[in-house]
């Protein structure tokens, strides 16, 4: 947004300025667009600064000083993930930048943007949001620096973090600042993180001990504690749990795992408690998660007047938009519970679904776009087939703390009917101007097995030749560490998929997404997977190395070498050479990987897989001497 655009709207000043590390795309798949439209819908004047130059504060001044606050996001993904490969090399393409150009956002973007804003406007409130701030809200392992870093709120000169899907939080913050409240007094909004002075925290704890009959060693209460009625010790310590401090978790991996387990199990909007984590210069306090949006609220958010286009100032397309331009978001949340995924911590396990009518209205608008070719190329949310699903316990106690929804097997309390999704897909197919409705990715195949009608409809109408699914691995030890279904479930799905395709008279294929280097995965496990692929014909180029990203179970395993829920020790491949060997075993047919595959087989004592026999992964040949 430019100053000229502000003037064209007849505005003399803005209420809120959003700063993002992504290009600005006015589409509901982009977090900044949603937050901007939601604030605008609530009556606020909103400006957006996309991908500012961060070497000095000048770009942050171009829209002037907002009346209420700045909101800062690194973008749709963590800036480390956007900028760097799993091997920590610079990426050669950025899907969230015009033309895929790299170098338009810094590493640790949320912190750097906040610093520049503070230089430009020292007294302005700053609210952090988005996946980077959300997943770094506690002390966390940082893969780039290979150490435990403080909460992002301790490192950035910001006042609040909005974590999760932040529509309700951001509007309430704006309304309360509009009403004249000081941002430092806004401490009671679910789904936010705030900070307290160390002295005030010690006094609050002292008062808590006094009320519990212990000796209060604190002096007179600070002004912060004395004036804030929400800091009644008796009530506070009923609603909040203290976890080990930054100093403790950064020095002891077992303590890190213990702290992780505590806050992971409290991420429940119904029964969860707030979390307190002391840091050397401040106290980080997370309120319990915000509730999911209702169906009516979700419908409203997704039917705001998005243009579905990039900002007109861009001369090149933004690749991320091209992937989702003609797709439809049906729901939020995921109860899959994969250890390496951040969605559980960001969107929660409880599914919030839009109404069928709302989705149909959006689909009709897509058909009216001049570049629409009759194909809706994606229908779903974090997964394709959890739309409309629910559990009878969610309303009263949220998602269960003592068990997962799908692992090690599908919970019988879960309603796994695809009936509502089937109705939606059928009605989408009937819309004038729609030739195909595809769901070629994101299908949770263990859920699909629960509903044969859905699987048959999927094969008959909603795949364009290939179905991309993510078994991730075929070693039981590794899929257990990932909290993913084992190969037996995969094989059952593949059999049913092939049977339904034969029935439909279609020739369609499964494309597997696989992962190397996950905690718990050894060279022997990778060889087991290579042998499975050899025997079952699932060789694929769709592979990735495990990347430790903040606040996932797998990252906790990677850093600590422990399962945070059982305390069991786990093998972790940290050596670059072993990581390369693990990845090479997934591409054992590639001649460029011969030496790495040979070394892996030699190290694992499996040279029986080198030779000309059918079972061999690579042929025997004269190796280059090093």
From Swiss-Prot:
Region listing for Disordered, in residue ranges: 206-227
InterPro entries attached to this UniProt entry: Elp3/MiaA/NifB-like_rSAM (IPR006638), Methylthiotransferase_CS (IPR020612), rSAM (IPR007197), rSAM_horseshoe (IPR023404), UPF0313 (IPR022946), UPF0313_C (IPR024560), UPF0313_N (IPR013704)
Binding site for [4Fe-4S] cluster: 334, 338, 341
PROSITE patterns: RADICAL_SAM (PS51918)
Cofactor(s) in the UniProt record: [4Fe-4S] cluster
Domain Radical SAM core, first and last residues per copy: 320-589
Keywords in alphabetical order: 4Fe-4S, Iron, Iron-sulfur, Metal-binding, S-adenosyl-L-methionine
Keyword Flavoprotein tagged: no
4Fe-4S is among the record's keywords: yes
Molecular function per GO: 4 iron, 4 sulfur cluster binding; catalytic activity; iron ion binding
Entry note: cofactor: Binds 1 [4Fe-4S] cluster. The cluster is coordinated with 3 cysteines and an exchangeable S-adenosyl-L-methionine.
Entries under Pfam families matching the protein: DUF3362, Radical_SAM, Radical_SAM_N
Similarity-based family: Belongs to the UPF0313 family.
Listed PANTHER family: UPF0313 PROTEIN YGIQ
Name used for this protein in its record: UPF0313 protein MM_1287
